[in-house]
Amino acid sequence: FIAAGGYAINDYFDTKIDLLNRPNRQIVGRTITKRTASWIHHITTAIGVLLGLFVSWKLKSLSLCFIFLMTPGLLWFYSASYKRMPFLGNFIISLCTALAPILIALANGEVLQTNYSPELLMQTPILPTIYTWILGFSGFAFILSMIRETIKDMEDEYGDKENECRTLPVVFGISKTKWILYSYIVLFIALLIWSYVSFIQDFALFKTIDEFYSLR
């Protein structure tokens, strides 16, 4: 729901840009009014935050509560101003993407600590292992999102330039932006190889999980 609200408010602020970059696919301003898009944002965001706060309350997790309250604000300011700045806009949206796996890690961590004794959890590195793997997934999600957002900026250069958005292609040009994109791709591939050699090859996660549940 929070992501849906983020898409709605992004389209609300991007009506002029979308009119230039993708006039045939524009929804806000043609299919629905900006006022309707604003209401969609308010309603879906409110539902998402309330559901998130309910889950946070049930799990007694302040970290989850903070994330559910912070994310809508980041998405709003991203759409209103941050996306018009080089690097910062892409960083914000990639951070929000990377938070999705972290939510799962935090929730599962709370469940494990609630249902198992601290002594049992200390006998195996189950929680650190789960957090390490989830952070790995979040890192890959972050880099992939940076790649995606950079490609989108390159596709939207014309409309962004006409509306005075200082995205990477507008500030540095398409040629230099391509090299930034290539660096993200090389980093992603390098981390993928390193992760396989360091973690996946010996199936350490599965061994840790088996050891943990054998102690029950």
Whereabouts are the PLM-identified features?
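C-terminal membrane-associated helical module and adjoining short loops/tails
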Residues: 45, 80, 98-101, 111-216
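Multi-pass membrane catalytic core of lipid/isoprenoid biosynthesis enzymes
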Residues: 15-68, 164-203
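Acidic (Asp/Glu-rich) catalytic motifs at the cytosolic membrane interface
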Residues: 1-28, 36, 144-168
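Membrane-embedded alpha-helical segments that form the functional core of polytopic membrane enzymes
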Residues: 1-13, 48-49, 62-76, 125-151
